[in-house]
Amino acid sequence: MKLLPLLLLLAAAIPVAHAQKASFETEAVKKTVTAFFDGMRHGDSTAVRRTLAPAAVFHAFSNQPNQPTKLGIESINGFLKSVGTPHPEIWDERVQFERVLIDANLASVWAPYEFYLGSKFSHCGYDSFQLVKLADGWKIAHVIDTRRKEKCR
């Protein structure tokens, strides 16, 4: 009978331990995405590349009025070259982490954003990131986003 209170205490601690681990992993995922945008803001293509998984994929789609949506693959190397090439304005993508879902070594991030060239608003939309947990931490495996100039949050 004396063992029952101890077992109940241990059983109550399991969800707390799981929640702490989930919170730690969520913060680690957010840290990777934040490092991606910090690198972009600083024009540091090496910092951006460190956040990417090998064979990462960026998708882009065009959504022109009266035209079917077209999906294409953006060149990672082209993107990194653009980030690292000096440009007059800071590329400032301001994200908010609306949803972070994690199952084992897979994470999905859904984040509304606003993009500024320097202090001038350019566009807004939603970023969708897929991350994988590799030996050296969470890495971005896939990015796709929407883009528009109005009807932002």
Where are these regions (language model features)?
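Sec-dependent N-terminal signal peptides
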Residues: L3-A13
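Hydrophobic pocket/interface hotspot
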Residues: F36, V48, A56, V109, ...
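Extracytoplasmic
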Residues: G43, T51-A53, V95, A104, ...
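Surface-exposed, charged secondary-structure patches
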Residues: L71-G118
